[in-house]
């Protein structure tokens, strides 16, 4: 509770700061004025004492001087303001830091709203290239003596050949690759959009994308390319079948890349779009609401497509045991809801001055009136009324817990609080705050009216003060009203597959206000036997002020319910109710403002606001589910790649970052690991699983194409001669493992049994450790002489570690430093290690040419509601669920 009390004082501190700043401005302006006067005096004295003669010509100079003085004073005041602004900003930053320390996942409100609204369906971005892991590259050929030939040869190599630094596990590379594919995985491919002209075509044909065109270009220009292939490239063009709405494009792809792109083409998420789908996309309650007039554009083309949003419910149950995460989600929902709740502007409310004047007359305030009655009018203004209206609806929409702020001696606040507790379900208030407010109402108004002793409430009592009072009060009307409040809960109703928290029908139609008024009338008629006459009169007048506005209160209750339920129709995630870590403060004086200033003007959300709210909710919910699917897929992949323990926290952190609204470093670790456990239980989505299986089946090909991943290492006690290789020159590389004793690296890491390997090495038998591991390339002859590869031997025999194993591949050829040492002296270089690596796949043009098929054309629409034109009836005619006007009191 300590930090809540600090929060209460914050406003006072801010006011003090503002006053101090004002004083500083005054002091600074005084100082600057004094400085100016001193400067002027100094200038005058200089002029008098100086012996120089001055010729005075005209008055224009004086005018210029005056202008300059004005300019300088303006500049000084600007500088002052800037200094003060920076001070204010600094103070805000300090307060923000203090707040961050108390709230685990706190984010500034404006940025949350922007982040929420910026979440767009990823489908909107067009895919302008095919997905590729490999690219063909020209590599030189070396002669037997290590000199480079003029000829080249084409091989398939990796486009992005990057490995995590300082890590044995090449499997991390595959996990990162999979993560990258999940990010880039297109929801649809329209080849017509990405097709580019084939420069070497005879008849202006097109190929599938720019990379295919550049590969064709490079091969066409290569001197060693056969004439048949050149003629084939010249004939490469698209084939259109207009009657079937199909087009075929030629592409140059590695077989694995072809498998990926074929999969993407055959598993597109686009679906045909028609008017019925758009009609059903609009929430049913808004479609059926007679206050909104919806018209639809009927001119949708047959090629229209859309991507169905992924709106699965409660897969992680973040409301259950994720206090910090749930607090952030409800906060962001609250800020979004506040931005869409309609404003009660001054013209929609009763004039504040006129209302206060009327209240003063009703109170018959005179000079001798007791202090408590003058408090009734304190803090009543239209801004507070509007703030209260927005807070109540937004808190219910986001299921944010509210806490009440009030002064016990202000009876008017407490009487307004009676209306608040009648209309808003108990669950919405912080338990301690609810108990304090109920206790104040009981001990200030209810018990004194009947002459009962003060209630002494025990902290931690399972019953609330109203529940205790309901059993003790004999008066039927008051007990009946207390009974209603004690049982005022949200009703959970599933509408269109979404769990909604709905209000009691008596609240929706405003009839509960009559029940409240009956109880208030009964209380005002009581004698208050143990209290002085002034006390009784104050309470009676407070009740009179509220009862005079019976009609307006009924209308206000109906208006509140209607706005809540209409906006609730746009919520797509289940409305789970759990008390939140932090609360939204609500001043009871602002509730009084709302009760006293509500007019007879109906305010309902505009259709554009509803559509905006619905779109933001759909986009967030869909993104949330897609990111869950990504995280579940990555966790499964990490498990199957034996990286399970290592990567888990970073996977969950990435998942939260991609949801946009979380301040991830502040999420407690226990919630991270609980989130991991929940994600682990979910099934992997089919597309993502198929993609991972494609990677798993082709790991060998990917390793072969990399310049940083070896497929094993051979270690010997004695030196082995470097061999000649066409791709590298002289190199310590093994293309096969025939004749070597083999040990699996994964087995060695898991068992930790190094006995077998050390015995073999000490008996002068070479050992081949088989498994993917990183290697480094060195082309320095000097370092080969220095035998740096001894470190590999030491890792195994002495340190008994393979997790940091990084063998060196020596490449000695005409491109190497000091190659003349080998060439001139017929020196035969040796090494105690050999890197096992198979030859990368040679590039064969005929085998790499694939025809890809897709629809000739279709148009994907992301904003379905843009086809709907909407309008509202005149607000005065707007009706509620019972077919009666929302506001009856005219």
Curated annotation (Swiss-Prot):
Residues 1-45 are annotated as: Disordered. It comes from the Viruses. It is found in: Virion. Keywords: Capsid protein, Inner capsid protein, Repeat, RNA-binding, T=2 icosahedral capsid protein, Ubl conjugation, Virion. GO terms for molecular function: RNA binding. The keyword Repeat applies. Residues 28-42 have a biased composition (Polar residues). GO terms for cellular component: T=2 icosahedral viral capsid; viral inner capsid; viral nucleocapsid. Residues 1-88 are annotated as: 5-fold hub. The record marks 232, 236, 849, 851 as: Interaction with the intermediate capsid protein VP6. InterPro entries: Rotavirus_VP2 (IPR007779). Sumoylated with SUMO1 and SUMO2. Sumoylation of viral proteins seems to have a positive role on viral replication. Pfam families: Rota_VP2. Its main location: virion. Residues 404-424, 432-452 are annotated as: Hydrophobic. Belongs to the rotavirus VP2 family. Inner capsid protein that self-assembles to form an icosahedral capsid with a T=2 symmetry, which consists of 120 copies of VP2, with channels at each of its five-fold vertices. This capsid constitutes the innermost concentric layer of the viral mature particle. It encapsidates the polymerase VP1, the capping enzyme VP3 and the genomic dsRNA, thereby defining the core. The N-terminus binds RNA. It is necessary for encapsidation of VP1 and VP3. The N-termini of 10 VP2 molecules form a cylindrical hub underneath each 5-fold axis of the inner capsid. Homodecamer; each decamer is made up of two conformers of VP2, called VP2A and VP2B. Interacts with a VP1-VP3 complex. Interacts with the intermediate capsid protein VP6. Interacts with NSP5. Interacts (via N-terminus) with NSP2. This is Inner capsid protein VP2. It comes from Rotavirus A (isolate RVA/Human/United States/WI61/1983/G9P1A[8]) (RV-A).
